[in-house]
Amino acid sequence: MYHAKTLLFYVHDWKKFPELEALYHQIYEKIPKERVQKKTVAGMGKSLQAFLSNLQVSHLHDVPIRLHLANKDFASGFYKKVHIAREPFRLVLKSLVEQGLMEFQPGFKTFTKDELFFSPETGEEDKHYGRLSRIWPTDRLRTMLDKLDW
C-alpha cells in the first residue's frame, strides 16, 4: 500500500476516543504478557491507546500513519516527551500485527548520498520515500471500528 499522503503518528488525548474503550480492553487481553517485566506491561496500555487512536484516524481519513521506530526517538525524542517507552511500544506493535488488526510496512534505512530509491507511484528517483515505517488498519479492524457508536 503506497500513499504519497500520510499522517504522522500522534499521541491523541484518549478522553476524546471513548468509543474505543471496549475495543481497547478486548485487544489488551490478547496481548501476550508472560515473561515480560511489570514495568513493560504497565506501559503497554498507553502504547495500545496511542496505536488505537492513530488507527482510528487512519481509518477515518483513509491514509496510513507514519511512525518513527529509531531508538533515539524513544531515548530523547518524541516518544520520550510523551512518556512512551520503546519495549512496550514495540510489543504492542508486534501483537497488533500478529492479531491481524494492523498492517505494518517497515521504513527503509537512511539513504547515503549514492543510494537512490524509485517511487513505485511515479517511477522517478525519490530519496525521501519510505524512511519512516507506516501502519494502517486491516479490513478486520476496519469492520470492528465501523461497528462502534460514534
What are these regions (language model features)?
Residues 1-44, 50-150:
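Electropositive, intrinsically flexible nucleic-acid-contacting patches
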